[in-house]
Amino acid sequence: MNLLTQYLKPYIGRISLGVSIKFFGSLMDLLLPWILAYIIDSVIPTKQVSAIFAWGGAMVVCSIIAVVTNIIANRMASSVARDTTGSIRHDLFEKVSYLSIPQVEEVGIPSLVSRLTTDTYNIHQTVGMIQRMGIRAPILLLGGIMITATLDPVLTLVLVGVLPFTLVAAVTISKRGIPLFASLQKQVDVLVRTVRENVTGARVIKALSKADYEKKRFDHVKQDVVAAETTANRTMAATPPLMDLFLNIGLTLVIVVSAFRVNQGLTQPGVIIAFLTYFTIILNAMLSITRIFVIVSKGLASADRIQSVLRLPQNMQVIEAPVKEESAHIVFEKVSFTYPNGTRVLKDIDFSLQPGETLGIIGATGSGKSTIVKLLLRLYDPTKGMIRIAGRDIRSIVPTELHQLFGVVLQKDVLFAETIEENIAFGRRFSKEQIEEAAARAQAKEFINQLPKRLAHPLHTKGSNLSGGQKQRVLLSRALAGDPEILILDDSASALDYRTDAQLRKVLRQQFQQTTTVLIAQRISSIQHADKILVLENGQMNGFGSHQKLLAENAIYQAIYQGQTGGADDAEEKNGKTKG
């Protein structure tokens, strides 16, 4: 509820005006039965046609005013609901954008998607319903009771005697319903995750003929959602029938008592007709209140889920740290890293790079190659040790300043459903010439010029209308476009043919001599010209040095080299040395 209160404050003026209009319209609705009773009991017996038409005209005017004011108030309620939800969705998206990677993993991407869509929709429904019916229903309920008390206090007592039972039932059931809707949203998160996995993994699923397996898995998740929704709705579904039961009992009692009082001459027929009309108004108001309880139950559960994300602390704090005087550009000083789940990935990684040097990183799958990049980008903080850039602890650098130093192509990087030009620029202000130059450097210009719209060619989500090599070259263009101080290429040439890969490495050597480069590759040919090569095994440094040094001294590097070249080049190199 704190979330709704906080975001509704800016619109308190508009809400107050809407409530006032709604209040006035509800009063017009309440006047209609009273006027009808007056016409039947007081005007018709006088047989004055003009008076009958006058009071009938008053009923028409009241009806028109009620309709117009309700329309205006409902439109204002919709605008407040729209703007409130828009503000919540904006702030939630902004918060999600700045969450650290560990926080994103803790909450879960499907859960974040669900909170940005389903939960914000539930809040939209809640805010709108509270303004439309949350104001009108109580006014009709209380106003109806007050007017009936002036018409016939005895009948009003019969009516009021039934209402506490309906209120107790509604409140009791709603208290049980809110936790159930929270549980339902968790199941929806699982459903979103399953759908997301199936959509993103469609090619793999089809290639392995696992469509039937995935269908069964989806059906299982769907059944869990249905079960959770059934439990929640079954609980809340008891509210309307109970309301009907209590109010119909009250209606029966009112009719019985009314008949007795009319026969005794204690009340008039017009009063009874008006009273039954008010009873119907009160009945509908109570039913509306029960519907409000259902909507509000969902809304409060969703508000709690959204608030839990908005309240997440900034766990990647910028600290104060002295600048160390050193010539090295990048320094890893005894860096170790363990994931929050306890899985140790890196241990005692220790190396330094001079400005303009190139570091190649190689190792088996799961050895921690990509984790080094994640730590350098400060997507995670080391569990132990320190990382410095130009003598500055990266934890002391503001994230926006830190990330501007890098040009990055990650292992599982993403292209967006925009044009090639927009994907390369990625929100940065580059001229078309700069973008074309970046594409040429990344060996992408040739295939881009063959496309119908060239740089304006629209891409599908994740660049699915490009080949693997084309996607990598567009990603490389994005990384090279800003002339970065540090270039990180994580397995960025795996889909390139050897000729293109060689041309790319030539460009990097000739045009990015002042750029410190970190290359992660599966092929030794992609990193053998690096100034330094880091060999990782099970998260630890197994070797560090030049290609020639590692080829002579490091068993793992030798095994990788021989596995990729068949040892032919090694034999030639050794023969050459023997002849010399």
Question: Where do the PLM segments sit?
Answer:
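Short intracellular "coupling" helices and adjacent cytoplasmic loop segments at the cytosolic face
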Residues: 46, 82, 90-114, 118-120, ...
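An intracellular "coupling" helix at the cytosolic face of ABC transporter transmembrane type-1 domains
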Residues: 10-12, 77, 101-102, 118-127, ...
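Hydrophobic alpha-helical transmembrane bundles that constitute the permease/transmembrane domains
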Residues: 23-31, 64-71, 123-126, 130-142, ...
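Helix-loop-helix
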Residues: 47-51, 147-161, 231-304, 309-310
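ABC-type nucleotide-binding domain
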Residues: 325-580
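Transmembrane helices of ABC transporter permease
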Residues: 10, 14-27, 62-68, 129-184, ...
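Membrane-integrated ABC transporters
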Residues: 1-29, 36, 44-60, 69, ...
